[in-house]
């Protein structure tokens, strides 16, 4: 995909909201349009957005830089991680993006934050280090080669914070990998707090790749834990799976005011992607509620835009060069 200078400027103006009139969900659409370019222009424009005040947007900026997977993005991501005044949700995403880009030079920097005051930042750095180290193993190198194969049809195109467990790394799961016995084993590994987080994440993404209702139930059991990072990743996985079977637990998470904003935000966006009729009332409720945390309210706004896209028949969500959408009615 190649864009003219005029088109790039239009996307930049949308993402950075230079007019002050661009709705958040339109900024996100423009951002994901840039992400799809996977080039230096996209990195340059996305990197400018960290001056914004919106934590949700900056978290999405960091995510997109990681998914572009270009070391040119590392300086800005390192700067975000090092900034103690930045929202922890943004710093965590910067660390995760460094893991996605996966250069050995990032390991010493990530190690500096293994004792960060914020738990989600500490845990993300732990997982990112383990991922970079795994990527350098024989299994990791083989998987990297497979993921870069243009002829491959992956189950998911995302660069995940941890690979699925062996046997469920790529391609459709074999029958022996989706048995109830295997799901129970993965569930046990997912919930075992004595295991390294990286290994628990591997079980999480293996269950995602299985994708059955039983696998969804196993993943949902992870919402009972005390790690906001872990629970937010489960909600993210549900947003990839798009299984209506996950809707009840995601609504419960969104409605749970004592839950971390980071977890509720991810639950909201997952609901928007699933886009069944029953997700609309809670999303509209939390857009309108005066007591909704900013990140939760904004995530519901983005989720409603996702819902409208999924139910519109439009071909492409990342259509940031089209006319801005109208405000979402609540």
Curated annotation (Swiss-Prot):
Function, in words: Catalyzes the hydroxylation of the N(6)-(4-aminobutyl)-L-lysine intermediate to form hypusine, an essential post-translational modification only found in mature eIF-5A factor.
PROSITE patterns with a match to the protein in the record: HEAT_REPEAT
Pathway per the UniProt entry: Protein modification; eIF5A hypusination
First-level EC class: oxidoreductase
Protein name per its UniProtKB record: Deoxyhypusine hydroxylase
Localization of this protein: Cytoplasm; Nucleus
Positions contributing to Fe cation 2 binding: 232-233, 265-266
Entries under Gene3D superfamilies matching the protein: Leucine-rich Repeat Variant
Cofactor requirement: Fe(2+)
One GO location term (cellular component): nucleus
């Amino acid at each position: 995909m190649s864009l003219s200078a005029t088109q790039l400027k239009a996307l930049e103006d949308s993402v950075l909201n230079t007019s002050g009139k661009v709705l958040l969900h339109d900024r996100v659409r423009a951002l994901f349009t840039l992400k799809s370019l996977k080039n230096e222009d996209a990195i340059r424009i996305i990197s400018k957005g960290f001056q914004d005040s919106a934590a949700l947007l900056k978290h999405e900026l960091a995510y997109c830089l990681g998914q572009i997977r270009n070391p040119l993005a590392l300086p800005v991501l390192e700067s975000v991680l090092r900034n103690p005044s930045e929202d922890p949700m943004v710093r965590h995403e910067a660390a995760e993006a460094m893991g996605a880009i996966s250069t050995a030079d990032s390991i010493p920097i990530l190690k500096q934050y293994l004792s960060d005051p914020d738990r989600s930042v500490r845990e993300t750095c732990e997982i990112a280090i383990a991922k970079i180290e795994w990527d350098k193993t024989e299994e990791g190198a083989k998987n990297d080669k497979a993921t870069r194969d243009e002829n491959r049809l992956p189950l998911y195109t995302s660069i995940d914070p941890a690979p699925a467990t062996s046997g469920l790394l790529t391609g459709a799961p074999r029958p022996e990998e989706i048995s109830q016995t295997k799901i129970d084993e993965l569930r046990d590994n997912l919930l075992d707090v004595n295991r390294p987080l990286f290994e628990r994440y591997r079980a999480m993404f293996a269950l995602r790749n299985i994708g059955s209702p039983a696998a969804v139930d196993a993943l949902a059991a992870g919402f009972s834990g005390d790690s906001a990072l872990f629970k937010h990743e489960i909600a993210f996985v549900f947003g990839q799976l798009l299984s209506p079977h996950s809707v009840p637990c995601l609504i419960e998470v969104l409605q749970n005011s004592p839950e971390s904003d980071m977890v509720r935000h991810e639950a909201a966006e997952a609901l928007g992607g699933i886009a069944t009729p029953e997700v609309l009332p809670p999303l509209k409720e939390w857009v309108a509620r005066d007591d909704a945390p900013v990140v939760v309210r904004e995530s519901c706004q983005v989720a409603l835009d996702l819902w409208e896209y999924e139910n519109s028949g439009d071909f492409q969500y990342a259509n940031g060069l089209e006319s801005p959408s109208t405000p979402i009615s609540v």
